[in-house]
Amino acid sequence: MGKQVYIIHGYGASPANHWFPWLKEKLIADGNQVSVLHMPNSSDPKKEEWLKTLANNIKNLDNNTYFITHSLGSITLLNYLEQLDPLPSFGGVILVSGFSEPLSILPSLDPFTVKKVDYKKIISATNSRAVIAAKDDHIVPFQLSKNLSKQLDTLFYPVEKGGHFLEEDGFITFPLVYDILNNMMKTE
C-alpha cells in the first residue's frame, strides 16, 4: 500500500525547484501519494503563514505519513508537529539542511527559531528520523544541522560536498533522500 509523503521546501524556493520534482515523480511511480507544499512568500516568509499552510494541507497524520523537508521547511515542520495535541504517531521524517538556531546570514528568519522545540514529543511520535547535511553548506552551517540531529536523536548523514543541496549546487536529483525514505518505509 502506498504512503503519503509531504515535501516541504525552504526559503526562496518553490515546488518546481531543486530536486523536488524529481523526487515527487520517483515516489509517485512507486505508488505513493505525494504533495509538494507551496509555502507562501518564500523570499519573505512569515512563520504564522507557513504554519497555517501546513495545518491546511496535512491531512490524516498517521503511520503511513512521511515528511521530507529542506532548510527552513524543517524547523517549520517541527514547530507545527509540536503544537499538535495530541501528536499522532507518524511514519518518519527526513530533514535536509535543517536547523533550529538563528542563521547569522538570514536574521529575518529568527522568528522561526525563537521558540525551542519539544524534541522529546516528536521523538516519541516516530522512530524514523534522519538529518542530511553537507560539510560545505554555505547557507546553513554544517554544525547547526548536526546539532539538530542530536536534539532530535536522528540518524545523521554527512555529505562531503553538497552545498545547500540546491539546483545551483548540482542537485536536480537526490538519490540519498530517496534511498533513506525507502528504507524507512520498509522498516514500518
Question: Locations of the language-model features?
Answer:
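Active-site catalytic motif of lipid deacylating hydrolases and related acyltransferases
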Residues: 2-63
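Catalytic histidine-centered segment of alpha/beta-hydrolase-like enzymes
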Residues: 45, 162-174
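Conserved alpha/beta-hydrolase "acid-adjacent" motif
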Residues: 138-144
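Gly/Ala-rich beta-loop-alpha elbow adjacent to hydrolase catalytic centers
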Residues: 68-78
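Catalytic active-site module of serine/aspartate enzymes centered on a nucleophile-bearing elbow/loop
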Residues: 170-188
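Short beta-strand/loop motif that positions the catalytic acidic residue
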Residues: 125, 130-133, 137
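Active-site nucleophile loop of the alpha/beta-hydrolase fold
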Residues: 10, 39-42, 93-103
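Catalytic histidine neighborhood in serine/cysteine hydrolases
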Residues: 33-35, 149-166
